[in-house]
């Protein structure tokens, strides 16, 4: 099973969009929203089909908190503004069987603006050439490996 972990903080305006997207996914998965102390109506807007865990503020800390609660053997960290293709989870078991312990998705921005398209191209090129990944691209990692490496750094920026 895949555990989708989403760190959130004051996301009331966009939280419904990702929940609707998550409901379209195929495969066996759980969703864990790791809240860093939202003060708006984010938590009220989370569907009861999804789990919420409470964490100190900080994306790395929130990701670690979600991972500790995860039931899956694969962790999939995404940001709350990411939209996933409905069959994305079906591809993960084959990659794990081939020995890939971690990975990411190709990023595509929902914008026709040239700068956003360049940003997406450069992000994907960075992954291909340098093996540097950000959670905007979705971070996939076997739970055992995540625990062995001690989780995400607990720093305010660039933890992922």
What are these language model-derived features?
Residues 1-3, 30:
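Cell-envelope/extracellular polymer assembly enzymes that use nucleotide-activated donors
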Residues 5, 10-24:
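Short, well-formed alpha-helical segments that are part of the catalytic scaffolds
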Residues 35-43, 82-83:
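A conserved acidic beta->alpha catalytic loop
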Residues 54-70:
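Glycine-rich, basic loop-to-helix element that forms the pyrophosphate-binding segment
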Residues 71-72, 136-149:
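Conserved nucleotide-sugar donor-binding
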Residues 75:
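Short aromatic/hydrophobic "clamp" motif used to bind/position activated sugar donors
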Residues 87-115:
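Conserved donor NDP-sugar-binding/catalytic core segment of glycosyltransferases
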Residues 157-160:
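Acidic donor-binding loop at a coil-to-helix junction in glycosyltransferase catalytic cores
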């Amino acid at each position: 099973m895949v555990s989708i972990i989403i760190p959130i903080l004051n996301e009331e305006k966009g939280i419904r969009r990702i929940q609707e997207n998550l409901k379209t996914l195929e495969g066996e998965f759980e969703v864990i929203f790791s809240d860093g102390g939202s003060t708006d109506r984010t938590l009220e807007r989370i569907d009861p089909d999804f789990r919420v865990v409470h964490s100190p503020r900080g994306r790395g800390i929130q990701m670690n908190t979600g991972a500790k609660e995860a039931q899956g053997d694969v962790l999939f960290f995404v940001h709350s503004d990411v939209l996933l293709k409905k069959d994305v989870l079906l591809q993960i078991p084959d990659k794990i069987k081939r020995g890939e312990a971690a990975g990411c998705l190709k990023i595509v921005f929902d914008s026709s603006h040239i700068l956003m398209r360049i940003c997406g191209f450069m992000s994907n090129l960075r992954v291909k050439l340098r093996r540097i990944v950000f959670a905007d691209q979705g971070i996939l990692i076997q739970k055992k490996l995540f625990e062995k490496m001690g989780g995400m750094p607990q720093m305010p920026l660039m933890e992922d």
